């Protein structure tokens, strides 16, 4: 388990990771050879084929401190403690999604049971664009793998403070959505600037909900960022924030599409750069997310990550098409300035939290839209957060989906926080029943993650 006191030391205000010599590593593979969005889609069957071949060819499964685990099929119950579907989850979730989630759960179990020090789930389909409400597929994602895994970890092992560090090139707007109102889950994403790449989100003002200011850290990086920039952000910004947050466990959403050869982005990171990034982070669990340079990047990036997590030498991991490139001076200056702005905002988080509540009594409301690019669904939402002076309140979503294969769908979903006491839980159910009496939506659902699970009202 991640320990900020033992794993990190502070020098001149910068936190650097110390290494555990040859930690044991669990690997879980689920390449989902029977699932694809389409035959030519980037998220297709052979995405992990070359990675598996590379790992076998390098003999990594024969290394004494590396152990392979089989995925499981995740139960519907644990998925429904995170997600609400329209018209229902079964309309969108396949067996492949349940096994992908189950692969992450198997990795977590191996670590939390003390069988290995760390684990890496190389699974697909990916999940970090999947939000709590599911009207279809967006950003290749339907179920949020890490979110369901975290629910399992909390429910089974009693872990409280969790940090997610998302190293995918795309902002993980789904993970942000699930945990935006949870002050005990720190979500950090550094990604290509949303003004230049899908999903167009992930900016500094997305700092967490009104009762969780500072629990959401979005670091939008300029196109052309290379190893130098990513490692600087990790050392000077991400690690110090983790040190202050003091998580019980750290999870890496290990997207690999920052690689210089990835066809869907414009970054300049190498396999060795990824390995060093992972070495600095010292995550307990890594879960594969994006990465679509199937032959030129994924086999080498994954090999580097495995070697790094197992405490082995990764200095010889070099892609066949590698050409040394240097990050431009303009990109470096931009990143330096961004780090300074973030340090200032992080230091002012309590002041920002107070300002956020000005004008709100016991409720905070926002309206926004979500587009499901793979399913053609346009969703309109009204989100309401119940504010208490001394505890975490529930939040609800009135969700209206239009177009797509199921035409018009509407759901009222009440989300009870996992930290809820009996009084909060009772009030949430009362509010959901009141909303149903008013009518107007197809379904009324309460999600009680540490209690009854998902309940139809």
Task: Report residues per predicted region.
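HDAC/HDAC-like amidohydrolase catalytic core signature
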Residues: 2-165, 170-457
């Amino acid at each position: 388990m991640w320990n900020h006191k033992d794993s990190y030391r502070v020098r001149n205000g910068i936190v650097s990771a110390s290494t555990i010599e040859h930690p044991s590593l669990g690997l879980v593979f689920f390449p989902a050879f029977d699932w694809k969005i389409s035959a030519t889609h980037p998220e297709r069957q052979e995405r992990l084929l070359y990675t598996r071949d590379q790992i076998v060819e390098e003999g990594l499964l024969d290394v004494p401190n590396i152990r392979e685990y089989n995925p499981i099929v995740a139960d519907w119950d644990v998925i429904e403690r995170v997600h609400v579907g329209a018209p229902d989850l079964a309309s969108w979730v396949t067996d492949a999604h349940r096994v992908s989630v189950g692969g992450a759960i198997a990795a977590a179990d191996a670590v939390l049971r003390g069988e290995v020090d760390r684990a890496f789930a190389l699974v697909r389909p990916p999940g970090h664009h999947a939000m709590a409400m599911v009207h279809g597929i967006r950003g290749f994602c339907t179920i949020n793998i890490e979110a369901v895994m975290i629910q399992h970890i909390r429910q089974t092992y009693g872990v409280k403070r969790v940090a997610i560090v998302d190293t995918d090139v795309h902002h993980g707007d789904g993970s942000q959505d699930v945990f935006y109102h949870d002050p005990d889950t720190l979500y950090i994403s550094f990604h290509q600037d949303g003004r230049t790449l899908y999903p167009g989100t992930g900016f500094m003002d997305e700092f967490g909900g009104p009762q969780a200011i500072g629990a959401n850290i979005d670091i939008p990086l300029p196109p052309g960022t290379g190893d130098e920039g990513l490692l600087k952000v990790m050392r000077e910004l991400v690690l110090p924030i983790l040190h202050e947050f003091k998580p019980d466990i750290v999870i890496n959403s290990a997207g690999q599409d920052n690689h210089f050869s990835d066809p869907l982005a414009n970054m300049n990171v190498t396999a060795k750069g990824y390995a060093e990034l992972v070495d600095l982070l010292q995550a307990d669990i890594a879960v594969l997310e994006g990465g679509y340079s199937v032959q030129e990047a994924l086999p080498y990036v994954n090999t580097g990550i495995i070697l790094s997590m197992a405490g082995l030498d990764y200095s010889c991991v070099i892609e066949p098409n590698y050409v040394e490139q240097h990050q431009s001076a303009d990109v470096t200056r931009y990143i330096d300035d961004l780090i300074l702005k973030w340090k200032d905002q992080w230091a002012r988080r309590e002041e920002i939290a107070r300002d956020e509540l000005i004008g709100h009594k016991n409720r905070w409301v926002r309206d926004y839209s979500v587009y499901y690019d793979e399913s053609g669904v346009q969703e309109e939402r009204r989100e309401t957060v119940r504010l208490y002076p001394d505890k975490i309140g529930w939040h609800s979503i009135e969700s209206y989906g239009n177009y797509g294969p199921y035409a018009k769908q509407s759901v009222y979903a009440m989300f009870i926080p996992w930290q809820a006491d009996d009084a909060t839980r009772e009030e949430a159910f009362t509010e959901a029943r009141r909303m149903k009496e008013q009518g107007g939506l197809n379904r009324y659902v309460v999600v009680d993650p540490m209690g009854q699970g998902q309940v139809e009202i």
